Amino acid sequence: MDSVFSNVARAPEDPILGVTVAYNNDPSPVKINLGVGAYRTEEGKPLVLDVVRKAEQQLVNDPSRVKEYIPIVGISDFNKLSAKLILGADSPAITESRVTTVQCLSGTGSLRVGAEFLKTHYHQSVIYIPKPTWGNHPKVFNLAGLSVEYFRYYDPATRGLDFKGLLEDLGAAPSGAIVLLHACAHNPTGVDPTSEQWEQIRQLMRSKSLLPFFDSAYQGFASGSLDTDAQSVRTFVADGGECLIAQSYAKNMGLYGERVGALSIVCKSADVASKVESQVKLVVRPMYSSPPIHGASIVATILKSSDMYNNWTIELKEMADRIKSMRQQLFEAIQARGTPGDWSHIIKQIGMFTFTGLNKEQVEFMTKEFHIYMTSDGRISMAGLSSKTVPHLADAMHAAVTRLG
């Protein structure tokens, strides 16, 4: 007898996660995985931060800890500390109780909860997202019932920001449209606006009543400074206007598999923020009821303790500095080989990813001939590189450019 699901078509492999599947199936000893967005040590190993291990040990040793359900909005301390981390301790939004923060399932979950709330309670159902953006963004917003449009962001000719196109497209967006903004370390391009450009974006968006929805996946991971990487968000919050912010602790605390994140919604008044929170609860309750305890407890433990917080900032800067060092080493290795073209974008871009400018054919060539795995758009994770593997990557890029043009 046929299955009632026999007509279900096989879904395509996720383009990013599929890179790792292909990498795992390759027996080559020289293979490199530059596809996945997770930090690796110089030895190519996953890293658990020392401060995270200490926090976990502290939690394990606490006999008063139980495994009861937590509130729909999550752990109160975690929410307060997360808002403080992204907005700044002295933010008027916090002191005036104009922000509601809800613990969610990492960045993706925070985006989805925010999108579901907006679909029901906001007068516009169109969201503008940068072209290109993280591959999951359009799916998250479409499945929440929002209509996705794109605004120009990256200029392949300069391998930098298409600022003119960005302003034109947002200027042409309907009044009140939602706009997704990467708070820092734009994924996949590594290209961020300058602080002056952010101010122009803010002025334009406020003049058209466009609603900012920030995705902050890399705070502290881009520049090495938590405050510097939050400046774009704080610029918008400082004007008293409203916005949404999705936070993730996957990258900056290395808590990838713990799924720890937060959604903050900054409102015009404490009364509105309270009503908004009551409705966000109605989004969460039928979706996953309440969030998990462990990861958020780790984050709250670290953010509450001045010693642990300081240790975290040191480890975070070490990760950011290693990525910057990989950029420099790769740039110098390409220069040394005399590879045609201007490769300065490798050291100008910021954060975990570099948008190399390599095309699909060149990427396929590098995978086949050199066992280097990356997404077909030419994005490479700098965190997956080491001093030992940079020469092999530079050789592959040189061969791809010189042989295929």
Curated annotation (Swiss-Prot):
L-aspartate binds at G37, W134, N187, R379. Disruption phenotype: No visible phenotype, but slight modification of the amino acid composition. Growth defect, when grown in vitro. The lineage of its organism: Eukaryota, Viridiplantae, Streptophyta, Embryophyta, Tracheophyta. GO terms for biological process: 2-oxoglutarate metabolic process; aspartate metabolic process; biosynthetic process; cellular response to hypoxia; glutamate metabolic process. InterPro entries: Aminotransferase_I/II_large, Asp_trans, NHTrfase_class1_PyrdxlP-BS, PyrdxlP-dep_Trfase, PyrdxlP-dep_Trfase_major, PyrdxlP-dep_Trfase_small. Changing G254R: In aat2-1; loss of activity. Its cofactor is pyridoxal 5'-phosphate. Pfam families: Aminotran_1_2 (PF00155). It comes from Arabidopsis thaliana. The keyword Transferase applies. This is Aspartate aminotransferase, cytoplasmic isozyme 1. Homodimer. It is found in: Cytoplasm. GO terms for molecular function: copper ion binding; L-aspartate:2-oxoglutarate aminotransferase activity; pyridoxal phosphate binding. Belongs to the class-I pyridoxal-phosphate-dependent aminotransferase family. Induction: Up-regulated upon pathogen infection. The modification N6-(pyridoxal phosphate)lysine is found at K251. The keyword Transferase applies. Changing P46L: In aat2-4; loss of activity. Its main location: cytoplasm. Its EC number is 2.6.1.1. It is an enzyme of class 2 (transferase). Transmembrane segments: none annotated. Changing P292L: In asp2-11; loss of pyridoxal phosphate binding and loss of activity. Important for the metabolism of amino acids and Krebs-cycle related organic acids. Involved in plant nitrogen metabolism of Asp and Asp-derived amino acids and in the synthesis of Asp/Asn for seed storage. May be involved in the assessment of the pyridoxal phosphate levels in the cell. The modification N-acetylmethionine is found at M1. Changing R259H: In asp2-14; loss of pyridoxal phosphate binding and loss of activity.
